[in-house]
Amino acid sequence: MPSSMSGYIPSYLDKDELCVVCGDKATGYHYRCITCEGCKGFFRRTIQKNLHPSYSCKYEGKCVIDKVTRNQCQECRFKKCIAVGMATDLVLDDNKRLAKRKLIEENREKRRKDEIQKSLVQKPEPTQEEWELIQVVTEAHVATNAQGSHWKQKRKFLPEDIGQAPIVNAPEGGKVDLEAFSQFTKIITPAITRVVDFAKKLPMFCELPCEDQIILLKGCCMEIMSLRAAVRYDPESETLTLNGEMAVTRGQLKNGGLGVVSDAIFDLGVSLSSFSLDDTEVALLQAVLLMSSDRPGLASVERIEKCQEGFLLAFEHYINYRKHNIAHFWPKLLMKVTDLRMIGACHASRFLHMKVECPTELFPPLFLEVFED
């Protein structure tokens, strides 16, 4: 083996430590002696294959072993290995070596599992106070979420011929199908009412000044309605169910007035379908959206911010409690809040175009009240 051999050198060795058998550069303790890789391998093979009885020296066992001559006489090399203290009992046969390797792997796997378990233990779960908050929010959502878990049985599909015939040209290359638009306006009032009812079931919301309540509701209404639709995405039919009753395709929602906003809501639905959110997680997402202290015109900014922080902390602890099998679940879920805020902003812009393109009499009063500035 060339003396310039490079590789891992243990920290316990001096920089220029030499092999006690041949004088080559040592790589560590092997079979109780400091040796090079070459002498380690030679000694191991000799013992494992019981080769030493076949070794014979041409010079009466008097060879000088160094890194040049070590391969010329196996008997003298082996004798020197024994003389310097290399231990034959430490050389494992194939079965023992496999058993040792298996044990090392098992210990490595056990350490890995212990580390995972330790990291899970270190993630706090909800306190008693947080559980009470979570219960209030969950009950508020369940009480105001149309059709609850039975939405698939209760939904009705919007006929395929509706939303396929664009009549009015809208800006940005979008189309508004007035028949589809009028269908959507029939369910928009109860959908908005349910969002308002959700908010009013939260004591911390009801304690805010009336003006702030209105600003918060106007700000979050489209975001919460979009979330409620997105979590009712059905991959089989590729539809969203609006207000727990009307199943629509991407094209129908787009042509019915939402334009590009439709794509954003559907994409969110596709993404959330792998998250398997329960009612509590949807409820807490809604509470976080509702209590957004950055809505323009708010008076009680600090108070609202503190409320949202309380929801976020309880939410994070609840996620720890749920133990989802998705890596980095919590930050990924928080990014959905950003997506929903973006949907709300895009809809505000889209609403202005709809006002221009669609007859005023088609807009329900509550729809105008919430989305007009």
From Swiss-Prot:
Region (Modulating) location: 1-18
CDD domains: NR_DBD_TR, NR_LBD_TR
Entry's induction text: By thyroid hormone.
InterPro entries: NHR-like_dom_sf, Nucl_hrmn_rcpt_lig-bd, Nuclear_hormone_rcpt_NR1, Nuclear_hrmn_rcpt, ThyrH_rcpt, Znf_hrmn_rcpt, Znf_NHR/GATA
Domain of life from the UniProt record: Eukaryota
Subcellular location as annotated: Nucleus
One example GO MF annotation: RNA polymerase II cis-regulatory region sequence-specific DNA binding
GO biological process: cell differentiation; negative regulation of DNA-templated transcription; negative regulation of transcription by RNA polymerase II; positive regulation of DNA-templated transcription; positive regulation of transcription by RNA polymerase II; retinoic acid receptor signaling pathway; thyroid hormone receptor signaling pathway
Keywords of this entry: DNA-binding, Metal-binding, Nucleus, Receptor, Transcription, Transcription regulation, Zinc, Zinc-finger
PROSITE patterns tied to this protein: NR_LBD, NUCLEAR_REC_DBD_1, NUCLEAR_REC_DBD_2
Zinc fingers typed NR C4-type, residue spans: 19-39, 57-81
Domain NR LBD, residue spans: 129-373
Pfam families registered for this protein in UniProt: Hormone_recep, zf-C4
Family membership: Belongs to the nuclear hormone receptor family. NR1 subfamily.
Additional facts recorded: A number of phenolic and phenol compounds can weakly compete with and disrupt triiodothyronine (T3)-binding including 3,3'5-trichlorobisphenol A, triiodophenol, 3,3'-dibromobisphenol A and 3,3'5-tribromobisphenol A. The synthetic estrogen diethylstilbestrol (DES) is not an effective competitor for T3-binding.
Protein function: High affinity receptor for triiodothyronine (T3).
Domain remark text: Composed of three domains: a modulating N-terminal domain, a DNA-binding domain and a C-terminal ligand-binding domain.
Name listed for the protein in its UniProt record: Thyroid hormone receptor beta-A
Organism: Xenopus laevis (African clawed frog)
Gene name of the record: thrb-a
